[in-house]
């Protein structure tokens, strides 16, 4: 059955198949009985899998990184599939279309995809409102703070933030600050994305002084909140040893 479905889906553009598949899952999960069945099949019932990292209690250590659910549209469905956490984004202050299509390519022999999306997303205002609605539906207060006690393992949501393509690097810190403020009540942790090769000039923000400015502003905001959030940094895999040392010094 899988091989048959795969061969049919491979007849269509990769990005279209992604959204088609997730929308089908969304329809299925809108039926309570079907969603309960999916959850029963996929959500592991093993307390030994719960983990505490960066001050957060995860149901299990298997999560989904940013890029799959950029706009926080499929949180209920991904939780039903058993993920312990999902990272939404990358989110930018303004909506942007991303790079021209096609921008997602299959490598069948490697069972992999090449991603050249370019931070396409609905913009932080729309995504923050979506997360606010999710928070209310899932037992959180109006401002996003969980009603669950902090020691109870739960489904964790991360927010991956970046800058708009039109924003000059000298002002990039403002974009990260806007996203941080808007998403802060509704996500459990942040990822500062300065590593994507699909946004021109973004990797230049990994340079020490540029990165210092971004992180300094975010830390100031975070420290002023009643509930601070962990801040993680996403860097490129090909940094030099000296560049890595600079990043570690800033952290």
Put a short name on every predicted segment.
Residues 58, 66-68, 79, 120-135, ...:
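Conserved alpha/beta-domain cores
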